[in-house]
Amino acid sequence: MITKFLPPWSVARWRSLAAGAVACLLAACGPSRSAFTESGQGSYYADKFAGRPTASGAPYRPGQLTAAHNSLPFGTRIRVTNVRTGRSVKVVVNDRGPHVKGRIVDVSKRAAAKIGLLDAGVAPVRLRVIRAAPGRR
């Protein structure tokens, strides 16, 4: 056994290092924040909001691929899929909302066009976090 050849303080150090390595490995393999998914109704911003500041401070730009979500941190990249069409788009959360009961996300006009949401205005969607931004959810 290797402990016969090492001083007691050295054995304790190696055990501490091994325990730390195991803890880091378990933390890295644990559940990821990017596993967040949500299903519900999605809609898109009205044209009247163009140029107005979002909750993050950036102005709303209809031509960008952005979204509003009530709890995901700003900067989080999510995939929004229109359940009816099967089409999806990647967007960045930069606003809070939607402020309508029963809705889980508002997307920009460009994002809405990509997933076939413009005509319907509201449709069932599925969200999946691609890359979580640092911060609270």
Regions found by a protein language model. Name each.
Residues 2-18, 22-137:
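Secreted/periplasmic proteins
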